[in-house]
Amino acid sequence: KPDSQDICFVPDGDYGKFIEHFTGKTFESGNFMDVNGNVVGTHKNQIFYTVGQRRGLGVTFGKPVFVCGKNAAENTVILGENKDLMKTEILVRDVNLISVPELNEPFRGTAKLRYSQKAAPVTVYPNECGLRLVFDEPQRAPAAGQAAVIYDGDYVFGGGVIVSAK
């Protein structure tokens, strides 16, 4: 099954409309940017898009393009090719370690960024903000705000919230 970009409690999948309805706000349009920082179009507002999204962008480029990132402060959405979604390093905050009281040295295990994903080999490093996860193979479309769960074999080692990916 392909990765879902939907929120389970929004039945029609229009989470932008859902947010507008429940906040009572309307949101300003912004710019689509390419991965090089060039303006390539306009969008409804960054709240209407998720990292990894391909459909419903309202722009065409003659090749498949995906949402590769968002900047809420500047209301920009970054578009690129599938290869631009692939990231090997992820920073995680709000860490909850299950197997150890703290991590003082690198840990070798596996991690998942999505529930249905197969756990991927990773080296986990402590850092000043939480953890730095370095995957053996690039992972598709990790997004800020998503959970990262780290495993030691069949057991949960810990996890946290993704802050950024590169």
Q: What role is predicted for each listed range?
A:
Residues 1-156, 161-166:
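Nucleotide-activated chemistry modules centered on ATP-dependent adenylation/adenylyltransferase
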